Amino acid sequence: MARQLALVHGRAGHVPRVTCVTCAAMRGDAALATTAAATPDAHSAQDRGGGATGPCARATSVPRAVIASSLPRPPWRTAGGSPLAVGAGACPYTPAVRELVSIAPDGAELFVDGRVLRVRGLAPDSDHEVAGIAFRTMPDLGALRCVFATGNDVHFGETVCGHVDDASGHEVFTSEPGATPYPEVMSRAAVAEIASCGPAAVVVKGDLTNDGEDEDYDAFLQVWGEAFGERLLHVRGNHDSYRGQGFAAWDRQVRVLDGVTLALLDTARPFEVGGSLSDEQLTWLDELGRTAHQPVVVLGHHPVSRDDELAPPFPLLSDDATVRLVEVMARRTSLTCYLAGHTHRNLVRRIEGVLCAEVACVKDFPGGWAEYRVHERGIAQVFHRVQAPEAVAWAERTRRMFGGLYGAYAMGRLEDRSFVVATR
């Protein structure tokens, strides 16, 4: 897989090495976990994706919110700036986990011993270490034009998480009796954090509900619509149309922002898990790409399909729709990337030069949303985990779904979560 962080300047080296043994084991890197465990004070094995080395400090007590430069003995080291780190309450479920969640031109996000830490105020293209995790910030992309955000797979109305079938034997997860349903907990946390970044637009890319019930769609609108009003764009997913329901079924939507145009497509088809695109949708997108005077980001619920080892065991966008979508986007260079949901994971592919990204879900682990910073020389995707303590607790419970395999599947690699989209 191409290293997406090198798209703008053709440079490698923006994918740091995460040297925590726990992270290594969770990601399925058995060799890394074994090597790291043998050298606990200076882990040096290679994380998938490569990058700079650095010692893995033992767990530290990270305060809930702290300006590092104000502490006489800060619990981490930095180089090139005095960051602002903002964290949420600790989670009791995975107290030993330390992960680099994402990087940005001015900072990074980490998950450290049950807290989400956001570090800001750093210089672009610079090396740092926070809580024993080394990373390099994204390159300087020029002046910021605007910010937009996306979420997907919020599943209002869902009551059981992790169920496959009665014979699977997998542990399932539910909200405690009398507690706020977990889809609402996760969405409210995401909405509050998205609102704080002042987005020009917010896009929810399908699976608004679990089973297409009108009352659940109303609940979605109450949480997301009341927060963002006219800034909100949303479209249905397969869970919203299993029984032929017709809400949020707009074939195509467009929103022009400062520095970028958003094109949202309805890929869902009634009574089907998989998705498709009509001739009319593709003709419209082709014409939009031909006449656009600024970069266009294309969005939909279903990701492109590929018959390879990364393909999930359920339908995605149809093969025909995938081929035709990629053909249009490869021909029209203003169409910069395709962003989807549906798979509940972070994954980036490049097909015929077209960047196609999947973003993990809001409703369970990792409990995430994506921020897109539109700069003069590229668009940075920065994946975020929700910070609210009750949301972190639920996300960490569901990390272990499907026999413990879900965590690594859903998180993906760093370059699946943080990358730069070249404005071609």
Description of each model-found segment:
Residues 190-201, 272-355, 405-424:
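His/acidic metal-ligating clusters that form di-metal
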Residues 118, 123-213, 291:
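N-terminal active-site segment of His-dependent metallophosphoesterases
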Residues 152-185, 242-248, 270-277, 312-314, ...:
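Acidic/histidine-rich helix-loop elements
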Residues 136-140, 214-287, 324-325, 350-358, ...:
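Extended active-site neighborhood of metal-dependent phosphoesterases/phosphodiesterases
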Residues 24-33, 43-58, 64-67, 73:
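Residue-level detector of structural "landmarks"
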Residues 157-160, 210-215, 239-245, 270-273, ...:
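Active-site environment of divalent metal-dependent phosphoester hydrolases
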Residues 376-424:
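A short C-terminal boundary segment appended to hydrolase-like catalytic domains
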